[in-house]
Amino acid sequence: MNNLEKWRFYLKDMQSPNSYINMGFYYMISCALQRRVYLNATKMPLFANQYIVLVGDAGLGKSMVIRHVTEFLKYHLLYDKRSLGVKTLPPGIPKRELTNKEKAEEMARENPEMFKEVMSLMGVDTSKMSFSKLKDRPDPLLIPVAANCTTYEALTRSLADSIRSIQPEMNGQTHMWVKNGIYSYSTACFSLSEVSSLFKKHHEDVIRFLHETYDCEEDYVYETKNQGIDRIKRVCVNLLGGSTFTFMNDAFSNRLLAEGFASRATFVCEDRPRFYKFAIPEFSEEQMACGVDILIHIKRLTTLFGQVSYTPEAYEYFRFYFEEVYPKILPGLPRALIDWNARMNIHVQKLAMAVHFGDSVEMTITLPSCQKAMNILEDLMTRMCDAVGATGKNPLADVGNRILKTLEKFGPKTKQEIWTDFVSDVRLVELEEVLEYLFATGKIKKIEGERLKSMRETNKLTDDIKERLQ
């Protein structure tokens, strides 16, 4: 099994849709790569960070995936002296020797008085040393995970405190980012069961921050009203959040979220779980072993640094699509996805890095990884309009989308049954207007017994794209 298959097996008893599980895995890989691995030249690097929002009704298993992703991201500590054999996980990573700094920190944490005595013998003044908060301070994470709900000020402060450094193997070469053999950067990932906790009203600064940090610029500078100037070096932010269609529609309709965020985020929309399950059993030894393999791979990824390249076949695949195929299909794309498609070349390359490094530590991306990334995004695009389609002013458009989702989820219904479901949202004359539009655009049709059936196709572009790319 490859690592994605191991992740699926690890979560095999979760009812979450496959797309949630898969994108949760790729988000985890992007978080592990942080701001260290990049495509393109060092002057205009493209990093693997992603903003991913799992959209669906309550009970689909969004939180299940996000919770397990967060547990994996939080496992490795910055100064990690554990093995993977603690408590529930079988042995996987051997313990290593502590550095002198780590030994001193451990002594100060566990026995402050002995630490003071040792420091005194070394001639250090310990009279003003305070250890009252040291025991309560959590060990820093190797991959920093930001707070669930935060103000802009707390966000920038958290990032400023999340500086990570590595000593990359340069093999006698130089790099403009590496100073005195060390590369430092500020990184954080948001794993939010409810993305609304971050995107509340009056959080315009947070939204603007996510817009500007998506490209992982060398410097992030923002002048606050009362706190002076915030400057964060080499920032990198990843986001995985859960949301409902209702919140997404309200957020876009009220301009709480705008096109800027919609073009940078990938929305994974589903309307039903993989299956229904009364209770989730304990993890088996085989599942736990798969979890260990993934944790080991994540640890390896945190040591990578440098420029990533494509094989000639992989580069030609993307070049042909975006220079020759994409301009021809662009006029037929849904209006709601125009902004997102403007950045599709960025989305697919970020995802291609996540797909490639999901199993490899080699710095060359191959054609299969590029093809897989393209296929994943094509599949997600078929439903993405459900999340970003509410940017207009017509409230009946939202009703039309919800009627389509109802017919897809529960099967054909009569007009009377639909009116019963939506009587609190529309009057009869408005419902007839919506149904007339759905008929005229071929999105629904009548079948036996005057029942209405959804005709929404999976993706009209997919077959055409695949034919052109062969």
Sequence positions of predicted segments:
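Phosphate-handling catalytic cores of nucleic-acid transaction enzymes
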Residues: 1-470
